């Protein structure tokens, strides 16, 4: 049983987040180890394992990048943990330029405003790549989707770096 089947969801990238959450809460209640306190040792162990499986599956499906990686793996394209280098020099150059731009924000005349504008630009880029991943996965374009997920991971890391700069500026 795959993660989508576990939650009774269609096996596709686009999913209903509120339905995922409600199914998660329902499964958590049903397989909570306390419900098996008087059961046999074997049944208690199975309940603990099922609860762990439910939690793991929820974490994977809840986040778009891990959900895309999971769908790719389910379709024979494993990219988790791989050390494949990015093959798109234009994208890598753009990422380097964006990181330089982020570094320069602290020295700008209005760093808060500059950071807001920069964050908006990066968020737009993230959403565009996410929409492309969805299309590529829906069309079964596994290699293209895998490449796009690699790019999304770069952008997500940049978004985290933006949050760190924001914390420094506001803190």
From Swiss-Prot:
GO CC terms: iron-sulfur cluster transfer complex
A GO MF term: protein-folding chaperone binding
A GO BP entry: protein complex oligomerization
PROSITE patterns tied to this protein: DNAJ_2
Pfam family, one: HSCB_C
Keyword line: Chaperone
Descriptive protein name: Co-chaperone protein HscB homolog
CDD domains cross-referenced by the UniProt entry: DnaJ
SMART domains assigned to the protein according to its UniProt record, in alphabetical order: DnaJ (SM00271)
Quaternary structure and interacting proteins, as annotated: Interacts with HscA and stimulates its ATPase activity.
Domain J: 2-74
Function: Co-chaperone involved in the maturation of iron-sulfur cluster-containing proteins. Seems to help targeting proteins to be folded toward HscA.
Sequence similarity: Belongs to the HscB family.
Coiled coil ranges: none
Source domain of life: Bacteria
């Amino acid at each position: 049983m795959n993660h989508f089947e576990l939650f009774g969801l269609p096996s596709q990238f686009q999913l209903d987040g509120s339905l995922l959450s409600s199914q998660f809460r329902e499964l958590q209640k049903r397989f909570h180890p306390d419900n098996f306190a008087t059961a046999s040792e074997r049944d208690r162990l199975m309940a603990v394992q099922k609860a762990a499986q439910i939690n793991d599956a929820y974490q994977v499906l809840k986040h778009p990048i891990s959900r895309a990686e999971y769908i790719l793996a389910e379709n024979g394209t494993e990219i988790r943990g791989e050390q494949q280098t990015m093959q798109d020099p234009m994208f890598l150059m753009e990422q380097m330029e964006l990181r330089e731009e982020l570094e320069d924000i602290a020295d700008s005349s209005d760093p808060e405003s500059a950071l807001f504008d920069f964050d908006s630009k990066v968020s737009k880029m993230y959403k565009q790549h996410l929409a492309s991943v969805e299309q590529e996965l829906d069309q079964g374009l596994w290699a293209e989707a895998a490449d796009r997920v690699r790019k999304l991971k770069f952008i997500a890391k940049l978004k985290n770096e933006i949050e760190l700069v924001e914390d420094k500026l506001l803190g």
